[in-house]
Structures are given as C-alpha cells and as structure tokens.
Amino acid sequence: MMKCLFLLCLCLLPIVVFSSTFTSQNLIDLPSESPVPKPVLDTNGKELNPNSSYRIISIGRGALGGDVYLGKSPNSDAPCPDGVFRYNSDVGPSGTPVRFIPLSTNIFEDQLLNIQFNIPTVKLCVSYTIWKVGNLNAHLRTMLLETGGTIGQADSSYFKIVKSSKFGYNLLYCPITRHFLCPFCRDDNFCAKVGVVIQNGKRRLALVNENPLDVLFQEV
C-alpha cells in the first residue's frame, strides 16, 4: 500500500511543478490597446481639417487676449514679414489665417505637424509663411517663433497641439533629433511650451518655461 502511494506522489509531482512554474513565471501578456488619438476641435466643436484655414485666438480678455498674426520682426533684414506675433488686445484686428499640416491625414492632439500662414503671397515670400523656431535671442533669453521654415523639417519646424490644463489648447515646439539645440525642451517628449514675450512693445510668440499661451482655433 505504501509503495502505491509513493508511486502516485511521484506521478503527480511533475504536474504540480509545471503548474506552479507556468502560473508564476510564464503568464501570457495580452497586448494592451493603444489609446485612441483625440482630434483637435475648433470653436464650433468640429474637427480641424488640414484643407481649411483657422485663426489662432488667445483665450484671454483685454491685454491678455489677441489673435496670432504674421508681422515684421524688429531689425530683420528678411525680404518678407517673418515674425509670429499676438495682437495686444482681444479687441484688435483679426489674426492671420493658418493651416495645420499633419504628418498623418488628420489633426490629432499630441501629434507632430507644421503650421503655415495661409495667405496669398508672392513667390519670394512663400517660405516666409511656414513657422519655425529661431536661434536663441541673447537679449530676450529665449527662442522666438518666426517664419522661413520647411514643411517636414524635423529640427525647427515641428509643433504639437495639446490640451491646456486650463481651457482650450497649448502649442508645443518639438524637435525630434537635435534636442541640445533647444534648452527649453525639457519635458519627457523633448518639447517646449509656446508663450508670449514682449519685443519692442509687441507681443511675440516664443518658447517659455511657464505660462504657455492658451488658444482656440476659429475656422475662417
């Protein structure tokens, strides 16, 4: 009898060991679902369309408001307007229309894209409609947004639209290769916030460490 019990235990031992090993070390990891990208919406709640034009509107009121526009940079020798500015008040003129050029077919939050002022212009000034980030401005101690970029250029012309922590959206500058050229790109994704600085009495879009510009997008 004892011999039969002993043989039975020997038969069951591999099953117990296999079961323990499988459950503790070889659990099957099911693939997790990727988050569904969220489309960026305009002021009417419609998804942004790469073929449409929009005004970038600051959410603030009074001196905190004002649309984004294309203007001449102070002391610039460029043959065309080459600066990205914000009007000094929400009761000022309407901003310059822009279009968003995504890497994919749609415009989603937290996705790389180019931004271009969508206005009639002479051939000489076509490249002066595409947004980019300039070199470090020693006087203002920041990097200013300007035009003269190239669609698809990774190091100076890529931006993202992300949800603001307050209301509306924020713009981010996100170079994807030479991060060392952007001392303001400090977050996990090597992006920098876009805000406003004062340059010669005008409000100029620039990279900031805090207080990013909260904006909405109004279809033209």
Swiss-Prot record:
Gene source species: Solanum tuberosum (Potato)
Keywords linked to the UniProt accession: Aspartic protease inhibitor, Disulfide bond, Glycoprotein, Protease inhibitor, Serine protease inhibitor, Signal, Vacuole
SMART domains given in the database record: STI
Known glycosylation sites: N51
Keyword NAD: no
Record protein name field: Aspartic protease inhibitor 5
Major site of localization recorded for this protein: other
Residues marked Reactive bond for trypsin (site): R99, F100
Motif (Vacuolar targeting signal): 26-31
Entry keyword Signal: yes
Localization of this protein: Vacuole
Pfam families: Kunitz_legume
Protein task: Inhibitor of cathepsin D (aspartic protease). May also inhibit trypsin and chymotrypsin (serine proteases). Protects the plant by inhibiting proteases of invading organisms.
MF-aspect GO terms: aspartic-type endopeptidase inhibitor activity; serine-type endopeptidase inhibitor activity
Residues making up the propeptide: 24-32
SUPFAM superfamilies named in the record: STI-like
Annotated InterPro entries: Kunitz_inhibitor_STI-like_sf, Prot_inh_Kunz-lg
GO annotation, cellular component aspect: vacuole
Site (Reactive bond for chymotrypsin): M143, L144
Signal peptide annotation: 1-23
